[in-house]
Amino acid sequence: DVCSSDLSPFGIDPFEPVRHARVTELIGEQTDVPAYSFPTLKEGEAVPEQEGILVFDAGSLDDLASTGRALFRNGRPRLMAGCAGFAALLPDLMKMTERRTVTMPKLDHRLLVVCGSVNSITLRQLDVAEQNGFSRLRLTPRQKLDPGYWESENGKEALRGINEMLAANPRCIIETNDEGGNQPTADYAAARGLDLEGLRVGIASSIGHMLGKLFTSPALGTLLLTGGDTLLQCMNCVGIKELEPVCEMEKGVVLARFTYRGCTRYVITKSGGFGYEKLLLDLADRIAAK
């Protein structure tokens, strides 16, 4: 269905809602450099000569390819930005001829999904996974927002419970959403004087500390992290500075590896608001089949 982004689930994101359907309007909030919007460039069409930021619309891969060829006709553009679909066209546009086939490594068949996203698309994926056998744990407001919780006695007890869950079920979910909505967490944050940014950072940091405690657990298998904040805080909390992309397992779902305390681990990452309903099930099946 066609829907402008400001009216989509991305428009009601509590942390970073998309308020504009036009990229030029979004750019205008962040810079005084003039931005201009143009339709797709066709074969042989001249590139507009305006000074500033030129935004080209596209409704298909063919549109992206057509605009890309027009932009590259007279040499490589100095500076570009675009979506992942456009990035996939760059090797041909830049005449990068080398092709390598990457084989997905054998992964631990046990899968832990850690979700810090509030996007409705992801929540539906979690529901479908739970309905098909995933164990699902929702962190409490205290677990998400109390600094030092995972070092406390209650935190240590909770970690023992998580390890037991991981050992008992090869497919598990740990998420930060309250059942039926996130009002309990919002109330808990308000009582402690946390604004929206404090709430966001606090939750992501708590997930990072929790995973830091789990990284050495023999019950932990392959990790799947949803949401950029979740990934960033997890890496920061355990001191990991570098992720090496390995391959794309599905569209927009990337397998990467990192080294932690001399041990190589794999992590699957995806955007919170991305993917079809059965994505988690299909990924779990694919890992188990390798």
Predicted regions and their residues:
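Functional cores that coordinate and move charged inorganic groups
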Residues: 10-12, 16, 22-96
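A short, acidic, amphipathic alpha-helical segment used as a generic capping/interface helix at domain edges
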Residues: 44-47, 66-71, 101, 154-166, ...
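C-terminal structural cap/anchor segments
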Residues: 162-226
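Short, small-residue-biased leader/transition segments that mark boundaries at the very start
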Residues: 2-4
